[in-house]
Amino acid sequence: MEALNALMFQGALLSDSGRLYRLQLPGGDVQVVERWSGSERLSGGFEWWVDVLSTQAGLPLEAWLGRRATLYSRLADGDESPRTGLIHDAYALGSDGGLARYRVGLVPWTWWLSQGRHSRVFQERTLVQIVEAVFADYAPMASWQWSEETSAFLAQARPRSHCAQYRESHLDLGHR
């Protein structure tokens, strides 16, 4: 009976109702946020680290990598403000007394563009064709589109005779 009461108490503590923050993970699984921190930069993306508590040890952390997760912050009026990113790192911090603690790192999809160096040559391709070819590898995680304001400019852009990507990241090529 005492063990059952302890489990019910833990379940009540780990409810996300009334909490300021909650993290929705792949598959709709919601975790209670213990704390979170991060940084955001203009033209540089963001990185958030979220510590969550769970009654389950051994959550499938590897399966979360590259998947979308949303950190919700409850506002003063009761509405929620979402911050969505892709999980680039997840690991267990330890467990104690039936609670497991995990840390999850969230970044924008463009972070993956910075991972790795590539070399390739584009010939007689427009800017649109080059960018779309580079971003095609990231289609499952990418969330982007050309803005309407750029359509007139892009329609006038002539093909480039030669554009080389030599040992640089896709992000660096995109910035260039």
Q: What would you call each of these model-derived segments?
A:
Residues 1-176:
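Amphipathic alpha-helical and helix-coil boundary elements used as assembly
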